Amino acid sequence: MFLDNRQVAMDSVQEALADSLDYFEDNAERLRPGLLKAFEPFYARRVELKQALETETRKHLSLMPRDADVERDDYMWLWSRLKSIVSNDNQVLINELLEQERVLMQACSTAFTHPLPDSIEKVLEGCFSNCRSLIRELYRHQMGQAARRRAV
């Protein structure tokens, strides 16, 4: 079965959501407790959005749920660990979480260029908003860490 452009766009959103959640879950133990506590509500909401999006895309676009890209995930995990050897582990993680958000924002933006049912658009808007809020939180913590390094 071939996918049309809007199905491809929505498939990309589903994959980006799955990758984002998977990356966070795989690396949560590496985050300081304060960072983990700050970021968890965003990812908890993201689980809800992912489930809602899967339901709506299955209903309206005949798309099946996407899993995270395991090979890419393994590569990202290894690369992150290597970078953490020479840099601050939390800073590396924040930068990589920001990159995950950029990928998700781009996928959402692309999906918004296609005609979609209102129920899917509503969930996409929730994803976009969640993504923007998490980016602000990540930058807030990134700036806080930079300020602490300068103070030392």
Where are these predicted regions, by residue range?
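Alpha-helical bundle segments that constitute or directly flank the non-heme di-iron/ferroxidase center
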Residues: 1-31, 90-118, 134
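Short, charged, amphipathic alpha-helical segments
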Residues: 11, 36-44, 95-99, 121-129
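A structural signal for well-ordered alpha-helices, especially hydrophobic packing surfaces
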Residues: 21, 28, 50-57, 79-82, ...
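Conserved alpha-helical segments that form or flank metal/cofactor-binding pockets of metalloenzymes
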Residues: 37-72, 138-146
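Charge-rich, acidic-biased intrinsically disordered regions
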Residues: 44-45, 64-82, 121-130, 147-152
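Carboxylate-rich helix-loop segments that flank metal/cofactor sites and access channels
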Residues: 55-92, 99, 103-105
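Preference for long, well-ordered alpha-helical segments
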Residues: 100-152
